[in-house]
Amino acid sequence: MSRIKIILLACMLALLFSGCVENSAVFEKNTATLKENTINADSVRGYDIASANNAFAFDMYSQLTQQVTGDYENILFSPYSISAAMAICYEGAENTTKEQISNVFYFPTNKTVLKVRLERINDRINSGSGDYELQTANALWIQEGYPVKEEYLFNVKKYYDGEVANLDFVRKPDDSRNTINEWVETRTSDKIKDLVPKSMITPDTRIIITNAIYFNGKWAYTFDKQLTEKRAFYPANGEEASVDMMYMYNNFNYGENSKAKIIELPYKGNDLSMYIVLPKDNNIKEFETEFTINDYTELKNEMDSTVNVDILIPKFKFETKTELSDSFVEMGVVDAFRQANFSGISNSPLKVSEVIHQTFIDVKEEGTEAAAATGVGMTVGMDFSWDSKQREFKADHPFMFFIEDRRTNCILFMGKVEYPEYKNDT
């Protein structure tokens, strides 16, 4: 007898998530009255969710680089979005299934510690200023009539602020797919479309978990469009390309060591920043293989805010869609896809069948839109000259980038630019 399937979706993009789409499915309000979990406050404080999220980010990045087959394949993902969706899955996992998810995502064995910390950090992320848009959203889509435990639903609603809806995957798969895709589009300002393909929903589908994170922010110091011009960019294979390169001269947090340079580009409001890590040698594949979370932390600790920096970085815009099941299995989450134990969700057998992660990013002069960025002095086309108090950050070859929430120290987005193609919307 085949096991009933649970589908996990993680989508990360950019922009404000608005109201629910109109459909026969009705979202339940957070009115559950089950007794809340209690736990020692010291146990909650002892778990550093940012460190766990960031460690997973580097593990996930390593897996994604192994999937790259072409010379110019950019990478973008949201470790926070993936972790948040898997945390909802973890809430119902038991025994070996729970242990494997815990090991890969650095989750504490005590589920209450995790959900209390996630609830607090989600509240902080979703309570930003009016200087930018940053919001997360969770939803649990359940087959009509499928028995899900009341305690699980209560925890999803309370601690994960999850919306819950019943759909008919069996008799109305197209309607169900359209409802979920419209939910995603609404919460990503139409940047992510058709997340759920027709082939995903089958008669065995019982639950779909979705998470979305959206960010739209302006730079604290915007790049002057008049200083953007075509300049040379050198992909890893050495073939020169002409790309739109933005220029700015200003005071920024900047650091370097023998292998790389790093710069922090803050967004308006100073709650979030983009960090760009530029290898000194044009060999991104060798660099990323050796670059660890500890290296990243140490490089950030080298940053100095007292120097002026001449910056050249390319505009870039791209989107990705990745199926992560094989990556998760390689990382150690095996039973969830095979001999799963999700008895905390339902007494009926469940297993994860697919994990889809779809992303979008747009980095230009004004800032960054991600789903999931004061030029002074030099005239366009002039050669640059440097003095001892200046630093140069010339991103004319492949680099890594991170978008972090400075309030929580969480890496929300992580990626790599191999080739900075930029196409304006038509």
Swiss-Prot record:
The record marks 381-382 as: Reactive bond. SUPFAM superfamilies: Serpins (SSF56574). Disulfide bonds: none annotated. The keyword Magnesium does not apply. CDD domains: serpin_like (cd19591). Keywords: Protease inhibitor, Serine protease inhibitor. Transmembrane segments: none annotated. The keyword 4Fe-4S does not apply. One of its GO terms (cellular component) is extracellular space. One of its GO terms (molecular function) is serine-type endopeptidase inhibitor activity. InterPro entries: Serpin_CS, Serpin_dom, Serpin_fam, Serpin_sf, Serpin_sf_1, Serpin_sf_2. Belongs to the serpin family. This is Uncharacterized serpin-like protein MM_2675. The lineage of its organism: Archaea, Methanobacteriati, Methanobacteriota, Stenosarchaea group, Methanomicrobia.
